[in-house]
């Protein structure tokens, strides 16, 4: 897998070649949101448990990234969880839309992929960046929060019996039914 900086440099070279102009001239016509996201990507320092792949930075209305979290500790250790982050032209004024692409048994992620992470809602600030988003997603797996749930069933078990919660997480991660919901294998 190419490193993000190499991928970005290749993309800039390709854009410059296609436009018949320098990278610097091409950057001047780029939207503020795209420039900010490119800066965020350049400055990104990923822990070994996280990967980020660029889906598209060329779309004029939105830019998308895949974020893969592979926790190395806690209840979700060994799982591979995929997220899509979509950045609109209003980024960084507005937060990106982030969804989980896997159906997982987690108190802060509902079965449809909606995520309960304050920095993606009311605590968002333009000072936050892609690094903060990645660390926020990683924290969901290190410290799931049963007091602010989207998945009430998972939150109830977490708050009541952490050992049982761990057993149900393992069962769900292996691709099984928990309660009335089937969770896909992410191990």
Curated annotation (Swiss-Prot):
This is NEDD8-conjugating enzyme UBC12. It catalyses: [E1 NEDD8-activating enzyme]-S-[NEDD8 protein]-yl-L-cysteine + [E2 NEDD8-conjugating enzyme]-L-cysteine = [E1 NEDD8-activating enzyme]-L-cysteine + [E2 NEDD8-conjugating enzyme]-S-[NEDD8-protein]-yl-L-cysteine. Its EC number is 2.3.2.34. Residues 32-178 form the UBC core domain. It holds the Pfam family UQ_con. The lineage of its organism: Eukaryota, Fungi, Dikarya, Ascomycota, Saccharomycotina. Pathway: Protein modification; protein neddylation. It comes from the Eukaryota. Residues 11-34 are annotated as: Disordered. InterPro entries: Ub_conjugating_enzyme, UBQ-conjugat_E2_core, UBQ-conjugating_AS, UBQ-conjugating_enzyme/RWD. PANTHER family: UBIQUITIN-CONJUGATING ENZYME E2 (PTHR24067). Residues 19-32 have a biased composition (Polar residues). GO terms for biological process: protein neddylation. Belongs to the ubiquitin-conjugating enzyme family. UBC12 subfamily. It comes from Candida glabrata (strain ATCC 2001 / BCRC 20586 / JCM 3761 / NBRC 0622 / NRRL Y-65 / CBS 138) (Yeast). Keywords: ATP-binding, Nucleotide-binding, Transferase, Ubl conjugation pathway. One of its GO terms (molecular function) is NEDD8 conjugating enzyme activity. Accepts the ubiquitin-like protein NEDD8/RUB1 from the UBA3-ULA1 E1 complex and catalyzes its covalent attachment to other proteins. The active site is at residue 116. It is an enzyme of class 2 (transferase).
């Amino acid at each position: 897998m190419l490193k993000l900086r190499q991928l970005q440099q290749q993309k800039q070279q390709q854009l410059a070649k296609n436009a018949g102009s320098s990278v610097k001239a091409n950057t001047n016509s780029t939207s503020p949101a795209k420039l900010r996201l490119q800066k965020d990507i350049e400055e990104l320092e990923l822990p070994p448990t996280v990967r980020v792949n660029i889906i598209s930075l060329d779309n004029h209305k939105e830019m998308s990234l895949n974020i893969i979290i592979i926790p190395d500790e806690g209840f979700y250790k060994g799982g591979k969880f995929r997220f899509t982050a979509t950045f609109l032209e209003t980024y960084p004024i507005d937060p990106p839309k982030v969804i989980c692409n896997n159906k997982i048994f987690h108190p802060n992620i509902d079965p449809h992929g909606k995520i309960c992470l304050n920095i993606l809602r009311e605590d968002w600030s333009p000072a936050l960046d892609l690094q903060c988003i990645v660390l926020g997603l990683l924290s969901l797996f290190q410290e799931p929060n049963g007091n602010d749930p989207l998945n009430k069933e998972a939150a109830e078990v977490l708050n009541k019996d952490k050992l049982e919660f761990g057993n149900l997480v393992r069962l769900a991660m292996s691709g099984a039914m928990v309660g009335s919901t089937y969770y896909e294998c992410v191990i």
